[in-house]
Amino acid sequence: MSVWGRRELVLAGLALAAVPAGARGQAPATGPVAVPGDAVQGALVVGEVGPGAEVWVDGKPVRVQNGRFCFGFGRDAEKQAEVRVRFDGGREVTRLVAPQKRNFVIQRIDGLPEQYVSPPPEVLERIKRDAYAVGEARARDTDEMWFADKFIWPTDGPISSIYGSQRILNGQPREPHYGVDIAAPEGAPIIAPVGGIVRLAEDLYLSGNTMVIDHGHGVSTSYLHMSRIDVKVGDRLNQGQQIGLVGKTGRVTGPHLCWRLNWFQTRLDVALLSPPRKGDRA
């Protein structure tokens, strides 16, 4: 199945109790556990439980709000996730969810300025500070529920790179690509795909003008290489609100938006949450 058509599997695949039709946003009644056997690598999995239930994923407690919780599988996840639910009254159930393996392409990019492929020693400390700031922005665990809404695309343009591709930059192997690149022209508007709170908005060495938006429960999206940032840290955003413009700042060969998704520090595939677009490829 194409990655562009897996939203329903990702968002609705983990149902820990039956949800009546038309009851979105209402916690289901306590009932038998029904969990699919798998979710693809890179998926954000959203589950629902009954009132008062507590949830642990791989032994760690996760936030439950209005019956909803989530967790994610990274690009290279192989181990099954153990989901343990304790219902109000003490009854517990446990289910295993296995990450389904995906095949990722190799992508070669040449013509990058050498200082961005092999940064000089004098900028390595800045790169470390940048990474720390991004990590702090992605570490928020708020009780907002925007992550469970339907995402829209933040800008228009062809997809030039997909999640998970193994990158070779100027002939040198580097870590995989963890975003979706949208080849929009410089100055094209970027909008919020769902509601959220701005947690980071600054110029970083490798990713240029960069923004991180918190969507609740540890789910965040990031926007890289922007030419302009139109909002500030702490702003609450509505879906469709303009947040900046497409650019070519940082380590790039041309204008585009690199759009990313995280569950805390786990890097996920934002395309799995986005509606399919005509002409997109798997």
Model regions and ranges:
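C-terminal segment of classical bacterial N-terminal signal peptides
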Residues: 19-22
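Polar/charged, compositionally biased leader and regulatory segments
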Residues: 25-41, 87-169, 279-282
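Ser/Thr-rich low-complexity repeats and stalk/linker segments
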Residues: 26-44, 48-101
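Non-catalytic surface loops within mature trypsin-like serine protease
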Residues: 51, 75, 99-103, 165, ...
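A short, sequence-level motif marking secondary-structure junctions
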Residues: 66-69, 98-102, 226-229, 273-276
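Short, charged/polar, Gly/Pro-enriched secondary-structure boundary elements
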Residues: 78-81, 103-107, 266-268
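Catalytic cores of peptidoglycan-degrading enzymes
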Residues: 152-282
